[in-house]
Design a protein with these regions (language model features):
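Short terminal hydrophobic/aromatic SLiMs and anchors at protein ends
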Residues: 2-5
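Residues forming the flavin
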Residues: 23-106, 143-145, 149-415
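Dinucleotide-binding Rossmann-like beta1-alpha1 core, especially the glycine-rich loop
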Residues: 87-137
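Ligand/cofactor-recognition surfaces for anionic moieties
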Residues: 20
Length: 415
């Protein structure tokens, strides 16, 4: 929940034994992902008189180091705090740095403030990124793309958006510059996960960590996917109503970069939506990474995958990867959509000992992939994963939708 005060308040002292100590802030921000960073940026630059603190479960940017080096450590070792998912910059700190400027996907902010205002804010974020290291990067647009017509001919819909691609390298630079700006204006508490948030008798908020308790007049919570379960509990404790949102379930597809080059060279990130004939479910592409790599993530102890790509051509690979997601909305009495998605990921981890990979041809034939069959492929996966059988993991309806979508995409990008 987002509660921001724009009025300075007096600083308060608290007594512990005979010791008087100061642990009160005007505003405390929980989470140093994009939501927390830009909240701190706005408050610190426009109201510098406010006393602000940011609490983050992970580490500062330069100390976020995943132990997987491809040599001594090749698979996730389940660190207590995942350096990829947690820390300054959030889960997207090492992603390919795509910022979408559109109301057609990526959130429903426009439902609260209107489409024009939502677009203005997205463009404002883009201006900040450009000012802090992103200058010179390309802004792609699908507004007048000829691929719209090509997609429609095959029952595919190319969503309209402008996409700023920073690349993993430039994205890191922007985040580093923002941190250097904020570190002298805001108190950062790294490796300090918040355990609980409570409302005090005077209306202030009590922020409880493992070793200390802090107070504030206003609190912003922006913890992201990795602490979504914790957020649900906080909402329950504070009697904030919630509802079961959709869950996106799918796979990450990797193929030779040449196959999608006609699309990625023009659009870079193409959000393509398809409605399946069999179930009328919506399937969409997500997080496209031209000449990128597939990487692992640890979310609540579950190993999943993401995609990275770099602006620097020297760091390009021969493959392009993207996610194919099927969106499901649940109705009463079911309320735990997050748990539904996580249970599928846990099953994949159980069967594959981590991330599972399968050749599309093997999937269609109902045949489990094995190391020999993976090695015989013309494509070399960028991630070392366990060959397996996705049909033993994914619900049939979800898998049918993904297969149908792949055949539809083959009409616009043969291969």
């Amino acid at each position: 929940f987002f509660i921001i005060s724009f009025f300075p308040c007096e600083k308060k002292s608290y007594l512990r034994g005979n010791e008087v100590f100061m642990k009160h802030y005007d505003i405390i921000i929980i989470g140093a992902g994009p939501g927390g960073i830009f909240s701190a940026y706005e408050l610190a630059t426009k109201r510098p008189n406010l006393k602000i603190a940011v609490f983050e479960a992970g580490n500062r940017l330069e100390k976020r180091k995943c132990p997987i080096d491809g040599k001594r450590v090749t698979k996730c070792i389940h660190c207590k705090t995942c350096a990829i998912m947690n820390g300054f910059g959030g889960a997207g700190a090492f992603s390919d740095g795509k910022y979408n400027i559109t109301n057609e996907f990526g959130g429903t902010l426009y439902e609260y403030i209107g489409k024009n205002k939502a677009t203005e804010l997205m463009e404002y974020v883009d201006e900040i990124n450009m000012a802090y290291g992103g200058e010179g990067t390309r802004l792609y647009s699908s507004a007048n793309s000829s691929f719209k017509r090509v997609c429609l001919q095959h029952n595919l819909h190319l969503l309209e958006a402008s996409v700023r691609h920073l690349g993993t390298d430039k994205n890191y630079e922007v985040l580093s510059n923002l941190y250097n700006l904020l570190k002298d204006k805001v108190s950062f508490y790294f490796m300090t996960p918040v355990q609980n948030v409570a409302i005090m008798d005077n209306g202030d908020y009590e922020i409880i960590t493992e070793n200390e308790t802090y107070t504030c007049e206003k609190c912003i919570i922006s913890v992201g996917r990795s602490r979504s379960k914790w957020m649900e509990q906080i909402c329950h404790n504070l009697e904030i109503p919630t509802n079961s949102s959709r869950v996106d379930i799918g796979v990450r597809v990797e193929l030779p970069a040449e196959v999608f080059a006609p699309i990625t060279d023009e659009l870079y990130e193409s959000k393509i939506v398809y409605q399946t004939e069999k179930y009328q479910d919506r399937v969409r592409t997500f997080c496209m990474n031209p000449k990128g790599a597939v990487v692992t993530e640890n979310t609540n102890g579950i190993i999943t995958v993401n995609g990275h790509s770099y602006e620097n051509p020297a760091l390009h690979t021969k493959n392009t990867n993207f996610a194919l997601l099927v969106s499901k909305h649940f109705t009463e009495p079911f309320k735990d959509s997050n748990e539904y998605g996580e249970s599928i990921a846990r099953l994949s981890n159980m069967l594959g000992g981590g991330v599972m990979v399968q050749r599309f041809g093997d999937l269609i034939r109902g045949q489990r992939s094995n190391p020999k069959r993976i090695a015989e492929s013309f494509l070399t996966p960028t991630l070392d994963a366990t060959p397996g059988d996705l049909s033993l993991v994914m619900p049939k309806r979800i898998l049918d939708g993904i297969i149908e979508m792949i055949y539809a995409l083959d009409n616009i990008a043969p291969g």
